[in-house]
């Protein structure tokens, strides 16, 4: 991990180069080295690298990253979505977070307030480039949180699998055309000034607009729909 191997005040490349020169770009070179090694050893197999650190350009080396060891509260959830969309806007398409937060409450299996948060994290993460659940020193299987939570999570896991043909097709576009799977609304609707104001809504490919719930106690919410020539169809009921 980078915080345990700081290049500051060190010299590399046979003592010829100050470590600061490569400090930020170093993670990309690590991904490049691993990618090229994987391709050399097994050229018929696609490479996939999941790395804690990254840098601009690492997408060319099949490298994905995530937002790191984060908490679980509502503000943290909101920040993850904004941060992820920011990464998409820089051209780095492979990103996710630890759904439910990496650091979780000690009573996570019985804490109904946390259960609401966990569900919302997973619902949003269903529409990320990668979907991932992880927690610090935790067993995170859905059934540990009770039947109600398990049922809801299972529904979204099933949805993720149903979306795989769409996800696979759009990921091909990411690779071949340099696009992104998840992106801010303004990237699809650049002439819509209100699209730029939507911090938490985003597009999942060209056909799905996602509006995750990012606060407690929400049963109804307003969703902004940019003007679209083809119109919009409710995903859940048509």
Place the predicted regions along the sequence by residue.
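Catalytic-domain carbohydrate-binding cleft regions of carbohydrate-active enzymes
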Residues: 1-238
């Amino acid at each position: 991990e980078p915080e345990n191997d700081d290049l500051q005040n060190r010299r590399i490349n046979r003592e010829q180069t100050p470590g600061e020169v490569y400090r930020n770009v170093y993670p990309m070179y690590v991904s490049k080295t691993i990618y090229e090694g994987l391709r050399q050893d097994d050229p018929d197999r696609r490479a996939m690298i999941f790395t804690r650190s990254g840098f601009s350009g690492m997408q060319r080396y099949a490298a994905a990253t995530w937002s790191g060891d984060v908490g679980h509260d509502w503000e943290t959830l909101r920040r993850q979505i904004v941060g992820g969309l920011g990464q998409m806007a820089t051209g780095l398409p492979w990103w996710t977070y630890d759904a439910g937060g990496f650091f979780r409450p000690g009573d996570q299996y019985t804490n109904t307030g946390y259960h609401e948060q966990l569900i919302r994290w997973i619902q949003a993460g269903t529409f990320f480039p990668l979907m991932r659940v992880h927690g610090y020193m935790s067993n995170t299987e859905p059934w540990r949180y009770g039947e109600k939570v398990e049922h809801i999570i299972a529904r979204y896991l099933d949805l993720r699998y149903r979306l795989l043909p769409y996800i696979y097709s759009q990921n091909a576009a990411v690779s071949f055309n340099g696009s992104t799977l998840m992106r801010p609304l303004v990237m699809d609707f650049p002439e819509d000034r209100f699209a730029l104001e939507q911090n938490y809504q985003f597009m999942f490919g060209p056909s799905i607009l996602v509006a995750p719930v990012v606060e407690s106690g929400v049963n109804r919410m307003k969703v902004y729909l940019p003007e679209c020539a083809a119109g919009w169809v409710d995903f859940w009921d048509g």
